[in-house]
């Protein structure tokens, strides 16, 4: 009897908000294959709204930073042990770990050893550093679902089963869009020249980057006094932190601080100065010229450089996807006012059509309807003998 014809149990774990969003789309798509499937594991509100039963509060897994993780370690280990035992006692037809690889791979390994099919949705950055983790991933999973094409190439090289499903952000953002609506929402006119500053979402990023970003904005506004500068800040705490640095650095700078609204700020901008991470992908999908400037604490940087080998030429996603430097990147001491100003000036004074065409081509390459692709791959794994 085909497994499509019986009620399935699908174990699924998301560790943070981004995973909950991916999980919501995946559950919706899996229901088309298995309308009566039971979903249970660790879910946020979006997955729960799709009918997923959560055995633990997802917030318990959303821990950032070494010190914070150590403080919560006994509880995390207890959850992991109980979760593994639950799924061994009540075997699902498949277990899907969404991102959170440090937690999920350690759940997947004992389940796979017990004969349960396992999937890791979102690859760890194993292609960039700590490459030996590929052996851990291979031992823990039957299938990896990769969001980016170069990730699949890496897994293929190591003969680890992997399906490239595309990126949900590329599905959510239109290939072409009208920026006038975003400008109107932010009180900007169609003729304004606009620079967006995105100094990160974490306190450490805002603390390390804001002064350099603000001083760069001062230089650019001196070149063009009509330049409008917008800064979306993720919450009230980050806004207060940025305001304090702004008042100490350039209290007379003409600048608009926004509550969230990062999507509108990106869409409205002629150019963006931003920290690394998913925001660089989002900026590319909005077809915006950008400069990436990033710093971490000198001691942390030294530890990373000393202990780990990095296998990448670039650290921003647009450049990794293009395998060339489409976006200027400045790290640590190179992330300075002179470099950032020099890189941004031409972006604010030309139409950047060739760059935007490259961004559009990459957008098309990763816009595959990721949730449907992921569900198809999971269904194929479930139905395989």
Swiss-Prot record:
Pathway(s) it belongs to: Bacterial outer membrane biogenesis; LPS lipid A biosynthesis
Q: Which Pfam families match?
A: LpxB
Recorded catalytic reaction(s): these are: a lipid X + a UDP-2-N,3-O-bis[(3R)-3-hydroxyacyl]-alpha-D-glucosamine = a lipid A disaccharide + UDP + H(+)
**Amino-acid biosynthesis listed as a keyword:** no
- Please give the superkingdom of this protein's source: Bacteria
Q: Name one GO molecular function term.
A: phospholipid binding
InterPro entries associated with the record: Glyco_trans_19
Q: Name one GO biological process term.
A: lipid A biosynthetic process
A GO term from the CC aspect: membrane
Keywords linked to the UniProt accession: Glycosyltransferase, Lipid A biosynthesis, Lipid biosynthesis, Lipid metabolism, Transferase
Name the Enzyme Commission number(s) assigned to this protein. Answer: 2.4.1.182
Role, per record: Condensation of UDP-2,3-diacylglucosamine and 2,3-diacylglucosamine-1-phosphate to form lipid A disaccharide, a precursor of lipid A, a phosphorylated glycolipid that anchors the lipopolysaccharide to the outer membrane of the cell.
Which family does the similarity line name?
Belongs to the LpxB family.
Q: What is this protein called?
A: Lipid-A-disaccharide synthase
Organism per entry: Pseudoalteromonas translucida (strain TAC 125)
Origin organism lineage: Bacteria, Pseudomonadati, Pseudomonadota, Gammaproteobacteria, Alteromonadales
Q: Which gene encodes it?
A: lpxB
